[in-house]
């Protein structure tokens, strides 16, 4: 288990003498090695140890105050925030969150691994419940739009967040097996804020620090969650109505673009026309509109 107390003491980027660090560690060399294995750079100069650059860890107490009455469960190092919510859902209320600095087994869409450098992203999952009689088609679009509105970036159907045509973040929605008469969901969100140069991601990616060099996760996180919950409450009342369709289209990275839709049956080309009241994608193919739902469908610009 990683020594988070030691990391917290090192996080300010100031040199720390070995004898001080040994108050927090029974085996300093082993603990330092574990920190390095998750991508942290710790310099050693004689008896002095220094973590570079400074690591701006989240302050869970301040976040809890900003998001009252929701409970914030701060798990600095965790396998998966979605998994934590799923395992603890019986003791949670709607809107309660799990927030992490680092995930060892984060998941993305279609079971892909979600890579998370330490304290370089906003990573959280929360519990939400819907009336089972109401449709939640288009839910991931609602989440994506809420994030795009706060960050002033773009969405790509069905659930990618883009800046400058590069992926800034992703969304994972899972159904929870919790028998309380509601449709129970775990919603996970990961957003790149400031990644180290050593981060190995196989596709072009963007970071919030490109948009706002002074960004602080501490203030951005509650702002995102508050707006997200506002959008979810509107969605519960109105669904994917005309107002939402227009708002989503205004942030759509592929609006009226020539695209290829990659399906299990093959590639379909056309011009993207936005979404309908179910959140389905509308594509003009020749003189006919074809509809696509999420599932195993991907989009590419031509």
From Swiss-Prot:
This is Bifunctional ligase/repressor BirA. Keywords: ATP-binding, Biotin, DNA-binding, Ligase, Nucleotide-binding, Repressor, Transcription, Transcription regulation. Residues 62-236 form the BPL/LPL catalytic domain. Pfam families: BPL_C, BPL_LplA_LipB. PANTHER family: BIOTIN PROTEIN LIGASE, BIOTIN--PROTEIN LIGASE. Its EC number is 6.3.4.15. The lineage of its organism: Bacteria, Pseudomonadati, Pseudomonadota, Gammaproteobacteria, Pasteurellales. Residues 14-33 bind DNA. It comes from Haemophilus influenzae (strain ATCC 51907 / DSM 11121 / KW20 / Rd). GO terms for cellular component: cytoplasm. Acts both as a biotin--[acetyl-CoA-carboxylase] ligase and a biotin-operon repressor. In the presence of ATP, BirA activates biotin to form the BirA-biotinyl-5'-adenylate (BirA-bio-5'-AMP or holoBirA) complex. HoloBirA can either transfer the biotinyl moiety to the biotin carboxyl carrier protein (BCCP) subunit of acetyl-CoA carboxylase, or bind to the biotin operator site and inhibit transcription of the operon.
């Amino acid at each position: 288990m990683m020594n988070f107390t030691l990391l917290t003491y090192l996080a300010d980027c100031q040199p720390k003498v070995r004898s001080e660090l040994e108050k927090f560690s029974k085996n300093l060399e082993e603990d330092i090695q574990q920190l390095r294995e998750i991508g942290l750079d710790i310099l050693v100069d004689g008896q002095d140890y220094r973590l570079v650059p400074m690591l701006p860890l989240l302050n869970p107490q301040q976040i809890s105050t900003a998001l009252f009455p929701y409970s914030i469960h701060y798990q600095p190092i965790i396998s998966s925030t979605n998994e934590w919510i799923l395992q603890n859902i019986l003791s949670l209320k709607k809107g309660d969150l799990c927030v992490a600095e680092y995930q060892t087994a984060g998941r993305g869409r279609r079971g892909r691994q979600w890579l998370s450098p330490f304290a370089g992203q906003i990573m959280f999952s929360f519990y939400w419940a819907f009336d089972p009689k109401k449709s939640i088609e288009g839910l991931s679009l609602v989440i994506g739009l809420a994030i795009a509105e706060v960050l002033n970036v773009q969405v790509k159907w069905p659930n990618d967040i883009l800046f400058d045509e590069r992926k800034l973040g992703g969304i994972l929605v899972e159904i929870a097996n919790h028998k309380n008469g509601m449709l129970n969901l775990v919603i996970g969100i990961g957003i790149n804020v400031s990644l180290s140069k050593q981060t190995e991601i196989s596709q072009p990616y963007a970071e919030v620090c490109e948009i706002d060099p002074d960004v602080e996760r501490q203030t951005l996180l509650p702002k995102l969650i508050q707006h997200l919950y506002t959008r979810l409450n509107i969605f519960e009342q109105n669904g994917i109505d005309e107002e939402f369709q227009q708002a989503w289209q205004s942030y759509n990275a592929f609006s009226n673009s020539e695209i290829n839709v990659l399906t299990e049956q093959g590639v379909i080309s056309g011009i993207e026309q936005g979404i309908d009241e179910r959140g389905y994608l509308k594509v003009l193919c020749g003189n006919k509109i074809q509809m696509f739902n999420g599932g195993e469908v991907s989009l590419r610009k031509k």
